[in-house]
Amino acid sequence: MHSYDYLLILAFLVLLLAPAPWLGRFFYRVMEGERTWLSPVLGPVERACYLISGVDPKTEQSWKQYAWALLAFNLAGFVVLFAMLMLQGLLPLNPQQLPGMEWSLAFNTAMSFVTNTNWQAYSGEASLSYLSQMVGLTVQNFVSAATGLAVLVALCRGISRRSSHSLGNFWADMTRATLYALLPISIVLAVFLVWQGVPQNFAHYIDALTLQGADQSLPMGPAASQISIKQLGTNGGGFFGVNSAHPFENPTAWSNLFELVSILLIPAALVFTFGHYVKDMRQSRAILGCMLALLLIGGAVSLWAEYQPNPALNIAGVEQTAPLEGKETRFGTTGTVLWSVATTAASNGSVNGMHDSLNPLAGMVALVNMMVGEVIFGGVGVGLNGMVLNVLIAVFLAGLMIGRTPEYLGKKLQAQEVRLLVATLLVMPVGVLVLGAIAASLPGPAGAISNPGPHGFSQLLYAYTSATANNGSAFGGFSANTVFHNLMLSLAIFIGRFGYILPVLALAGSLAMKKTAPQGQNSFPTHGLLFVTLLTVTILLVGGLTFLPTLALGPIAEHLSLGF
């Protein structure tokens, strides 16, 4: 590594952490309906949305009403997007005259984007019209992220409220999250990307002649507006097939840096939003410390692994400087590895290089980031939800060790809360191990693997881990566009999304009804170094031990077999 590489890592951390406290405070004020500097502009738009839809933002909902509203909204979005993808050949803004999607692929794509997963078994420039990209996928990029933010706010209210039977209003939370939290930042980033050279037009594809004399079609389209929210909303689905490795999607080192920062910016800010809700910023600092520790450990391991010389090339006597297979030279090894860690630490899934080409242990870091439940920053809203669940599990374990009824911020954790926590622990194993085992045991679906041996198993394991974790990235050698995998991965995506959201809302409703007991000297502190250590170990044990056998069969076996 050179000085530039260290400077890149430092710039990434500074740009990520410096604005996070301010944004966190802003998001808190926005979601609670307080007046902000954007209110004169967006306030009339917000009120118009309520008037047109007949929503009273002051009418609060119980956790069940909140959940039903969320499910109804997501179902409607799925149906509309599925129909749009199937019928895109008949719809306008399709200058390339692309036909409608095959039904299983359309089903998978709709499920993927509605749930903020953005798993893509297609190439955007060859499969989707501008209308499908702009009205179908980009809209879902906004509202799926807003859904996650709304669920987080509901959980924050459940923890902070006393003897309450309501969690807020889903429709108001969705509207505020979209208008105030996501839209303004996305516009700023989109303008920056256009300045850097990302297309934003409705032009036909351009036929060009290469230096070698071959014909080439250069894709166009409204890319910048979709790419900005794909990063900020931790969606990750690329406008073009190779995602942010494409020179039109990520043309410069500056666009690479700011797209990289935007992956984790809102999740980092929401940690401070949580502190404002519970009126204790020490909780935010503890959670952020745990997230940063896990991120930096994963980044260090991944960078070390990726800079190891290839044993096969050593035997051949080839001089090695940096492994560039599957990487864009304009980003280099460090820029690609840093992105792979950030995109899997969040439920983003965008890539600026091919994860399939990472060295085995670097690929394992990406897998582990997802297997722990996308809690290392995680997706917008849902990532912090997962981290708070791990906080409650750590508190429960601490209570068992000291022989006291576990409590968090004055709320006692009793049998009902523990049952809900256990239910969320089953989500990743069911989606990854059960569905993945079914796919691996059948000869037809297993044929999607392009590489025999441990790496082929890693390809399949990565696909089902990514789907269940609502990440969306993939080892590119896995041929996912079959009816079986389209439907099975859709099921994994559904389990991974709503298997977390519904128990979280039920938990929020249960906690909201509890009274808050004053914390005494015997209360277990949840803001010191001891608790941060306990929380980190809990995350690694719950995620690591569950999936250790599969990791041993995949990336660990590959690492050993290659002679690293």
Curated annotation (Swiss-Prot):
Its main location: membrane. It is found in: Cell inner membrane. GO terms for cellular component: plasma membrane. The keyword Cell inner membrane applies. The keyword Chloroplast does not apply. Keywords: Cell inner membrane, Cell membrane, Ion transport, Membrane, Potassium, Potassium transport, Transmembrane, Transmembrane helix, Transport. InterPro entries: KdpA. It is a multi-pass membrane protein. One of its GO terms (molecular function) is potassium ion binding. The chain crosses the membrane at residues 7-27, 67-87, 135-155, 179-199, 258-278, 286-306, 382-402, 420-440, 487-507, 528-548. Belongs to the KdpA family. The system is composed of three essential subunits: KdpA, KdpB and KdpC. Part of the high-affinity ATP-driven potassium transport (or Kdp) system, which catalyzes the hydrolysis of ATP coupled with the electrogenic transport of potassium into the cytoplasm. This subunit binds the periplasmic potassium ions and delivers the ions to the membrane domain of KdpB through an intramembrane tunnel. This is Potassium-transporting ATPase potassium-binding subunit. It comes from Pseudomonas syringae pv. tomato (strain ATCC BAA-871 / DC3000).
